[in-house]
Amino acid sequence: MSQTWLIVIDPQTIFASPTSPWGSPAFPTIIDPIDRMVAAFHGRTIVTRWIPTATRCGSWCDYFDRWTFADRPANDPIFDLVDEAQPWAERP
């Protein structure tokens, strides 16, 4: 397992908030299990963050037409990692 890395995909407000159309009501239940996995991987964790593209061309045009609430600047707080995920992204 020393060469194995944990990847935590998009633990962001946009997917966690109950007020977000993409929010999952089960999101709070993943925090403790991920905390335990992050500890077990001893610094070998990568955390991703979804942000909208700068240009809305190609397939993204239809996507943002459908999900207009997500058509925001990439620095909008809705795309921030949830507070609990901040330590997962820290580098020693």
Model-derived features: where do they sit?
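Active-site acidic carboxylates
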Residues: M1-R91
